[in-house]
Regions:
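Transmembrane alpha-helices of multi-pass inner-membrane enzymes
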Residues: 50-53, 310-314, 461-473, 477-508
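Loop-to-helix entry and N-terminal half of a specific, functionally important transmembrane alpha helix
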Residues: 73-78, 284-294, 444-475
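Alpha-helical transmembrane segments of multi-pass inner-membrane proteins
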Residues: 140-152, 173, 190-322, 445
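A conserved mid-to-late transmembrane alpha helix and its immediate loop/hinge
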Residues: 247, 251-257, 294-298, 302-303, ...
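N-terminal hydrophobic segments of proteins, predominantly signal-anchor/transmembrane helices
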Residues: 18-29, 65-172, 469-472
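Hydrophobic transmembrane alpha-helices and their immediate junctions
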Residues: 278, 310, 314, 318, ...
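Long extracytoplasmic/lumenal interhelical loops at the membrane interface
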Residues: 353-424, 443-450
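A membrane-periplasm/extracellular boundary helix in multi-pass inner-membrane enzymes
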Residues: 34, 201-217, 300, 317-366, ...
Length: 508
């Protein structure tokens, strides 16, 4: 017995069998790599990943989990999502692009697996948080399994495998790390402030880009980060709407639309810090961010960013009024907002048609007509495809299956709804948005039931951002900001668990 392990001698025949099996597998791998080459590198490397997982699983149990390293890695991951261009990467043949985001995500997943493997306390805390609403994590697991299964019927298996692994790393790092960290007191508020700071950094880069006419790093990228890809070249060159010729700011994002989405998703957090009783300097900084963010959205020339701001403001007003009414029973203003809310929605909707500038920002003008028409055509083209195969065509295949090309002759798909339906079918669509809708429901319920709990107030911007996300994804297919959504889902689940746990403790 050494170090908690017991030495065991295996029969000679078993050892010979295992050595022979290893040699045969090595010969097979060598033959496959020699005949197919680097495109098969991802598949050939799968057993190595399995060995790492088995090694982590075999670690002796004990309370020595490296959970302290999760926080710096996590916030580096949060910052990289907004501040590092995801198209600047090291490219090795047969492997996905080695970006900063994927590298940090992989390290997070590795540390997280070690913590889960060795620490019973760590597992217990995560299990308690996930148990706050099992429907959500079950939807997430089912959605991941569906993604994995779709590789089997995908017409381009290698590309789909790359997409699956990259997606699982980003989602796993974002969701499960957040499940653990957001149980800490005050962590949700700290995350929200950090989120606003990093998005503000992306906005400042966007303002700089607007002065230069292209992203600041165009022409100044180190050789080891340069990717010989026409899409990347187009991003670095910058873009403009064909009807106006005016440069559209994109900052670190791959498109102006993704930047506008990111700023729109952050709006509820800025509104939160302006609205509640935070120190004056924080409220002023949040107000300044609102002005800057709105200005950068205008520079992106993206309607979806304005829509996200509008949706966030309207739904935040409702949740704020509910909390005020629940806290101050004698209030007149708060219940007046709640009861008149249907009228507020109707007025807001009608104003998008009657007010000229508002109509242009929401529904577009002549300059955006081509984009509007393209989205209509895509839905018309997609419906027969969805009817032919309601189970989807495989991860990462939606654009090819749809077959739509924009005016420049480039394949395009403009709705994440379509992407889900074409990739994973009706089931995938239901699992993904069912998970988000359920999170919104339990978050709103906690706000209503425990309005005075500081953490339940903090859940409001997370819930509102998820509502805005559902609206925005109807007109944007890219998943550039997907990691933030998984963080928000986990944040809501963790806050719900904390508030309910505190309520039980108070009753006891």
């Amino acid at each position: 017995m050494r170090g908690g392990y017991q030495t065991r001698t295996y029969p000679l025949w078993l050892r010979l069998f295992l050595m022979t099996a290893v040699v045969l597998v090595a010969l097979f791998y060598g033959f496959r790599f020699a005949t197919i080459g680097t495109p098969s590198l991802m598949m050939l490397g799968a057993p190595l990943a399995l060995v790492v997982v088995l090694f982590i699983w075999a670690l002796p149990p004990g309370e020595y989990a490296p959970s302290g390293s999760l926080v710096p890695l996590y916030f580096a991951f949060v910052a990289a999502q907004a501040l590092w261009p995801n198209y600047l990467a090291v490219v090795l043949p047969g492997l996905p692009w080695l970006t900063v985001n994927r590298t940090l995500g992989s390290l997070l997943v590795l540390v997280l697996l070690i913590c889960v493997s060795v620490s019973k306390t760590f597992r217990g805390r995560m299990g308690e948080t996930l148990g706050a609403d099992p429907f959500i994590w079950r939807c997430l697991i089912a959605y991941s399994l569906l993604q994995a299964a779709s590789i089997l019927w995908s017409p381009s298996g290698t590309d789909s495998l790359n997409d699956f692994i990259s997606g699982q790393i980003m989602a796993g790092a974002a969701f499960f790390t957040s499940i653990y960290l957001f149980r800490r007191a005050g962590f949700a508020e700290f995350w929200a402030k950090t989120f606003l700071i990093v998005v503000a950094g992306a906005c400042l880069l966007g303002l700089w880009e607007n002065e230069l006419g292209s992203v600041p790093w165009a022409g100044h990228t180190p050789s080891f980060l340069r990717i010989d890809d026409p899409v990347v070249m187009k991003i670095l060159a910058g873009g403009a709407r064909a009807a106006t010729g005016i440069h559209r700011v994109q900052s670190t994002a791959t498109t102006p639309l993704s930047l506008a989405e990111l700023i729109g998703l952050s709006s509820a957090f800025a509104i939160h810090f302006v609205t509640w009783r935070y120190p004056l300097y924080q409220r002023l900084l949040a107000a300044a961010y609102v002005v800057m963010g709105f200005h950068v959205i205008i520079l992106t020339d993206s309607r979806l960013g304005f829509v996200a701001w509008m949706v966030s403001a309207i739904f935040y007003l409702l949740m704020w009024a509910v909390v005020r009414w629940r806290e101050h029973k004698g209030s007149i203003f708060a219940p007046a907002i709640v009861f008149s809310y249907p009228a507020i929605l109707i007025v807001a909707f009608i104003s998008t048609f009657l007010v000229g500038r508002l109509r242009a920002r929401v529904w577009g003008s002549g300059a955006q007509q081509a984009s509007t028409d393209a989205r209509k055509i895509q839905w018309e083209m997609a419906m027969p495809r969805i009817a032919e195969n309601p189970f989807g065509y495989g991860i990462g295949t939606a654009g090819k299956v749809l077959g739509f090309k924009n005016q420049a002759g480039v394949g395009s798909i403009d709705s994440f709804y379509l992407t889900l339906l074409l990739d994973f079918g009706i089931l995938g669509f239901a699992l993904y948005f069912g998970m988000i809708l359920r999170t919104i429901w339990i978050g709103g319920k906690v706000v209503y039931e425990y309005p005075s709990h500081p953490e339940s107030r903090m859940i409001i911007p997370f819930v509102v951002s998820l509502i805005a996300y559902i609206v925005v994804k109807s007109v944007l297919s890219q998943e550039t900001n997907g990691a933030y959504i998984y963080m928000m889902l986990a944040a809501c689940l963790a806050i719900v668990s904390t508030v309910r746990s505190d309520a039980k403790t108070a009753k006891a």
